[in-house]
Amino acid sequence: IALAFVIVMYVCFTFCYTEMACAIPKAGGAFDYVNLAMGKNWAFVAGLAQIIEFLFAPPAIALGLGAYLNLFLPQIHPLIIAISAYLIFTGINILGIKTAASFELVVTVVAVLGLLLFAALALPHFSISNLEFGKMPKGFSGVSAAVPFAIWFFLAIEGVANVAEETINPQRNILIGFGSALFTLVILCFLTFSSSVGIAGWEKVVFPAGSQQASDSPLPLALQTLQVSPYFVTLIGIFGLFGLVASFNGIILAAGRATMEFAKSGNAPKPAAMVNQKFKSPANALIFNMVIGIIALLTGKTGEIITRSEEHTSELQSPCN
């Protein structure tokens, strides 16, 4: 139910946001749209909501990346891997939009191929009874609690708008970008949800056998229940890394532009508004975002931070809707 609600919400939102992005191709996204429509005070609220999302989603993804790599490199702490990821991908984005976007395209294609492989392995074992549509042990409060996690299927798709200012023919290409992104995410959302939960129930992709602690690697866990070759389990784990990298790099890319535009209006430290003259990238904004993200990582509460940031983002954006 939570997933169905989120799909409808994001389809409606994306259509509206695409129209604004094409009409106002600015790096600030929601901040610039609200500034023109409702003035600087409401623009501050919308811009802050956007930056909260862009600042606090990457730490959770970085820690997930660390947890995945820790399966292959158990001698390295996940936190060290997460901080290293921040340094590496912030560096890639500082090199400029062409480098960052080209890298993003490659890792995204690999990640999509991985999800398609997972679906091909799992869907033959799908049973609709495993989805348990009629069982709601927590009632609608459970559905409400699941919404922030369902949002992760589409999180930060609005970041497409933040690169509109650097896009050739944005009225055409931003439309194509948003449309293809939404179509891809909806299809992959259905495939991934159905082929994971639908093979043995949600418990089998959350809790490892004999444990009550939630796993950070649900797709390999799902394949283990099917007793497929360990080769495929490892391969899906590697593809999962590419998915996390694609999400992480994509949000860093959009976040740098959003913070830069926010700073141009005096709402963030002025140095964050500066563009690197050599690479033509918002280097200072990217570094500022990285520092905040690493601090969030060091708190050890990235899951709680992202859940609360999504809730507060919705609260901040509601007056602007």
Question: Model-predicted segments: where are they?
Answer:
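Short alpha-helical transmembrane interface motifs in multi-pass membrane proteins
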Residues: A2, F13-F15, I81, I128, ...
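Hydrophobic residues within alpha-helical transmembrane segments
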Residues: A4-V8, L48-I52, S84, V106-V109, ...
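Juxtamembrane helix-boundary/capping and inter-helix hinge elements in multi-pass membrane proteins
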Residues: P25-A27, L36-N41, E165-N173, S180, ...
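TM-loop-TM module centered on a large, flexible mid-protein loop between adjacent transmembrane helices
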Residues: D32-Y33, G39, N70-L71, G177-N249, ...
